[in-house]
């Protein structure tokens, strides 16, 4: 018996006690939780091989998208919806690694700007190439139609959760 069979058996047992029990809804929720955990673990392992985590990657990615590869910590925090404390921790790490540098803002001396260094640009480019292969492998057992359907359903659920 695999994990999903056991999961269904447990939920079916609850349904047998109460025929109105939302079997499918409970099963879908449990499957989403398990898929999410597997993806998070896999992603953590992938980024861990490069000495970073997903949050660090997101900061590098957002900086690499900017025309001047430069943002203030508060802009990064706002765009990624990360706390200022988390941004400080991440930028401290990235600065020690040589991937970013902090400079005084030209507009306001009280603030700093975070800029990607050439080493940081090289790192994010190398990481992006590896990520292309990783992501294709991660989703390789789904057809194109299944991927589209998963995307539509996921977006619909996320929008619904924003409303409740």
Swiss-Prot record:
Record has Transcription as a keyword: yes
CDD domains tied to this protein: HTH_ARSR
GO terms for MF: DNA binding; DNA-binding transcription factor activity
Keyword vocabulary terms for this entry: Cytoplasm, DNA-binding, Transcription, Transcription regulation
Gene Ontology CC: cytoplasm
Major subcellular site: cytoplasm
Transcription in keyword set: yes
Cellular compartment(s): Cytoplasm
Domain HTH marR-type: residue ranges: 25-159
Protein name per Swiss-Prot or TrEMBL: HTH-type transcriptional regulator PapX
């Amino acid at each position: 018996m695999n994990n999903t069979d056991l999961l269904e058996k447990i939920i079916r047992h609850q349904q047998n006690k109460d025929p109105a029990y939302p079997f499918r809804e409970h099963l879908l929720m449990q499957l989403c939780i398990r898929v999410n955990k597997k993806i998070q673990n896999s992603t953590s392992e992938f980024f861990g091989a490069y000495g970073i985590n997903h949050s660090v990657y997101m900061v590098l990615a957002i900086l690499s998208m900017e025309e001047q590869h430069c943002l203030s910590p508060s802009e990064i925090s706002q765009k990624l919806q990360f706390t200022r404390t988390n941004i400080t921790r991440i930028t401290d790490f990235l600065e020690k690694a040589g991937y970013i540098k902090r400079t005084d803002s030209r507009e306001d001396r009280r603030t700093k700007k975070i800029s990607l260094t050439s080493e940081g640009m090289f790192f994010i480019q190398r990481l992006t190439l590896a990520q292309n292969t990783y992501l294709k492998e991660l989703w390789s057992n789904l057809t194109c139609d299944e991927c589209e359907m998963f995307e539509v359903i996921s977006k619909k659920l996320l929008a619904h959760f924003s409303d409740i």
